[in-house]
A protein has these predicted regions:
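Metal-dependent active-site segment of extracytoplasmic phospho-/sulfohydrolases and closely related
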Residues: 71-110, 149-153
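Catalytic-adjacent loop/helix segments of enzymes that bind and process anionic phosphate/sulfate esters
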Residues: 1-81, 102-103, 111-143, 176-199
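Non-catalytic, well-ordered alpha-helical segments in soluble enzyme domains
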Residues: 127-130, 135-166
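Localized sequence-composition bias
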Residues: 92, 172-173
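Generic structural signal for secondary-structure transition and capping sites
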Residues: 28, 88, 154-158
């Protein structure tokens, strides 16, 4: 894909077919990067034919955003299944480059550099040798990504130390760029919850 996230409404689900195609070639080990467009505004454009079960409880764009998260969950589940079918050994790492804020404003789904939700994104790891679910609620700074990648893949470089997000601690404060300057992530206000309408 060329252009910005809004230049074409290509369905992220098409990446699953491309992944199947790449894994069919068994000639060498692979590192595959999938760049999904995800829930960018307007999230309704990202659903394509995905069902939206939230329309009766939330305003349309917020409902679309929630449905897009459901679609992402399904995508990751399908991707995990593809990897399990094709590979004896695999690891999958998912993260988002930024969060989205949801409000009842005229532009209800948007990136907001002044709330914690703009930077609090999931980091999901599955692998063929992971046998139990483990959840970590502490903040992990994105600057540790290269170390996490090394820890997960076994690829090593001289200048970066592997970083296990389950056990390794990073005592540096998490700093984020709020659109104007770097600020401590903890200084940002929390995102208020949008409760469903009881129609």
């Amino acid at each position: 894909k060329k252009g910005s996230f809004a230049s074409r409404k290509t369905d992220d689900m098409l990446l699953l077919q491309e992944t199947e195609r790449a894994l069919a070639d068994k000639s060498s080990p692979k590192v595959i990067f999938l760049h999904m467009i995800g829930s960018h505004p307007n999230p309704c454009d990202r659903l394509n034919s995905w069902p939206n079960y939230y329309l009766e409880q939330y305003p349309r764009k917020i409902a679309c955003y929630l449905a897009s998260i459901s679609k992402l969950d399904n995508f990751l589940g399908q991707l995990d299944g593809i990897l399990r079918r094709h590979s004896r050994h695999f690891a999958m790492l998912y993260f988002s480059d930024h969060g989205l804020s949801v409000s009842d404003s005229a532009n209800p789904v948007h990136h907001d550099g002044h709330v914690q939700g703009g930077y609090s994104v999931p980091l999901i790891i599955t692998a063929s040798d992971i046998t139990s679910h483990q959840s970590v609620s502490r903040k992990i700074n994105a600057r540790n990504f290269a170390g996490i990648f090394q820890w997960l893949t076994g690829i090593r470089t001289e200048n970066i130390t592997p970083f296990n997000p389950l056990t390794d601690e990073d005592n540096e404060p998490v700093m984020v760029f709020n659109g104007e300057k770097n600020v401590p992530a903890d200084s940002l206000k929390p995102q208020p919850l949008i409760l469903p309408d009881h129609r």
